[in-house]
Amino acid sequence: MRKTIAVLGSALFFVVAPLVLAGFVPWWITHWEFRPAFFGFELTRAIGLMLIIAGVPGVVDSFARFALQGLGTPAPIAPTQKLVVTGLYRYVRNPIYVGVPAVIFGQALLFGDWRLLWYAALLWLFFHIFVLVYEEPTLKQTFGAQYEDFRANVPRWVPRLTAWRVP
């Protein structure tokens, strides 16, 4: 039963958070209308599309791992019961907080819209402060040495080149 509740909670939080932050808000800002490519380089559009294609599945996978393995959600009001250290979490501690701004940044490049660049940067800054002030201290208190080992081996923002092997 716990897994079912976790899946439903994660699905609801996915709609409330990433779908709104990386879908609705960028659409509201740009109406997904193409503007001239940044600096006249059409290649930026392809790079943007690649960021979107890489970011969306990464965020979805991370949400699924929270529900199915962590038996909770990414939302602070319904946190995981277990520390999730598989999948993209073997490369970076915050794949959702990396993936959502990457999708927004990708849309900025794809649509050639500077406003989305600023939005992505401000959102990432908010995520960074939230991680430092709330999330990391809470995870340390909740999971203790297990989290400290994870934290010592997996970077916060820039992914490792090789997967961390959980001892």
Kindly give the residue locations of the regions a language model identified.
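Solvent-exposed interhelical
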Residues: 89
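Membrane-anchoring alpha-helices and their flanking helix-loop junctions
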Residues: 1-86, 98-167
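Extended, alpha-helix-rich binding/interface surfaces that flank or overlap catalytic cores
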Residues: 94
